[in-house]
Amino acid sequence: MKLSRIALATMLVAAPLAAANAGVTVTPLLLGYTFQDSQHNNGGKDGNLTNGPELQDDLFVGAALGIELTPWLGFEAEYNQVKGDVDGASAGAEYKQKQINGNFYVTSDLITKNYDSKIKPYVLLGAGHYKYDFDGVNRGTRGTSEEGTLGNAGVGAFWRLNDALSLRTEARATYNADEEFWNYTALAGLNVVLGGHLKPAAPVVEVAPVEPTPVAPQPQELTEDLNMELRVFFDTNKSNIKDQYKPEIAKVAEKLSEYPNATARIEGHTDNTGPRKLNERLSLARANSVKSALVNEYNVDASRLSTQGFAWDQPIADNKTKEGRAMNRRVFATITGSRTVVVQPGQEAAAPAAAQ
């Protein structure tokens, strides 16, 4: 009785825990027929039973709870019992055989790899503990019970009805090691799978990396700066522009057109000959001559041009020589500004305007 209580408690505790996982199997009822070994009936290795009383073959009843370890390998904890008559003893003599087993089974899927087949033959190997209780007949000098270790070997098949239910049939031989006798059982049951059968891992498919879609380069906005200088030289006491400098003034006008926000600072200078007042007016007149050329001939907005006369205050050469005085009679202009240009892919930005 104690053995059956342990087995029942183990299954009741394990069942709700196991049900949460795929591949858990429950066989709530195993029915079969056990054939008792004549060696046991005739006394076993120690002659514990007389040659007269015989254990009769009888109904096998059991239950099992298991788990699929792989798609082809499973393990089950099983409890079963056989209750039968003892012939040749006192009237009403009977025996009760109880077992608790741990069995591994391997299905044909190990070889065939046909995991969706409807019929799955299997082989079974396991071990456990058995106990016989006798009522109305003595077991020789050992009293009314015997127990020991057993080993199981069997063949069977799962007949799959659907993904959750299978009919199970099996032929099993049980070797009772302590008494050295065999029992043989033919059994059947309904096998229930909780959460679905285990499936083999899907093959890993290596997906080729997807090359990113090329993104067309976008146009870029760049800022171009303008830094330009102009030098115009004059004759003594003159403010008119010589023809040789007009192309240079035209270049300045062109850049002022290309850079709409550019401005020009125009400075007039003289040598040190003559009165200061005269040279102040002359230096400013020379600056205004360049400004007038830009405004009148090239339509440059006058507000973008500033002029100033410095007389002889900023010489760049020695006024004691003729050559030096010629260098000092000049206009010097600085033109500065910037513009934003859109550069297309593959196109180089224009180089900044060079100083003149």
Swiss-Prot record:
SUPFAM superfamilies: OMPA-like (SSF56925), OmpA-like (SSF103088)
Pfam families: OMP_b-brl (PF13505), OmpA (PF00691)
InterPro entries named in the record: Bact_OuterMem_StrucFunc (IPR050330), OMP/PagP_b-brl (IPR011250), Omp38 (IPR054882), OMP_b-brl (IPR027385), OMP_bac (IPR006664), OmpA-like (IPR006665), OmpA-like_sf (IPR036737)
Main subcellular localisation: membrane
GO biological process: monoatomic ion transport
Impact when changing residue 271 to A: Periplasmic domain no longer binds diaminopimelate
Signal sequence, renumbered to the chain: 1-19
UniProt keyword annotation of Protein biosynthesis present: no
Knockout mutant characteristics: Significant loss of the bacterial outer membrane, not as able to induce apoptosis as wild-type bacteria in human cell lines.
Keywords: Apoptosis, Cell outer membrane, Host mitochondrion, Ion transport, Membrane, Porin, Signal, Transmembrane, Transmembrane beta strand, Transport, Virulence
Keyword Transport carried by entry: yes
Ranges of residues in domain OmpA-like: 221-339
Residues that span the membrane, as ranges: none
Bilayer topology term: Multi-pass membrane protein
Chain sites annotated for binding meso-2,6-diaminopimelate: 237, 271, 273, 279, 286
One Gene Ontology CC term in the entry: cell outer membrane
NCBIfam families: Omp38Acinit (NF045788)
Role of this protein: Functions as a porin. Induces apoptosis in human cell lines through caspase-dependent and AIF-dependent pathways. Purified Omp38 enters host cell and localizes to the mitochondria, which presumably leads to a release of proapoptotic molecules such as cytochrome c and AIF (apoptosis-inducing factor). Binds peptidoglycan, contributes to cell wall maintenance.
Domain-related comment: The periplasmic domain (residues 221-339) binds peptidoglycan (PGN) and diaminopimelate, one of the components of PGN.
The protein's assembly and partners: Homotrimer. Forms a pore with a size of 1.3 nm.
PANTHER family named in the record: LIPOPROTEIN YIAD-RELATED, STATOR ELEMENT OF FLAGELLAR MOTOR COMPLEX
Additional notes on this entry: Live A.baumannii and purified Omp38 elicit identical effects with respect to the induction of apoptosis in human cell lines.
This protein's name: Outer membrane protein Omp38
Species the sequence originates in: Acinetobacter baumannii (strain ATCC 19606 / DSM 30007 / JCM 6841 / CCUG 19606 / CIP 70.34 / NBRC 109757 / NCIMB 12457 / NCTC 12156 / 81)
Gene designation: omp38
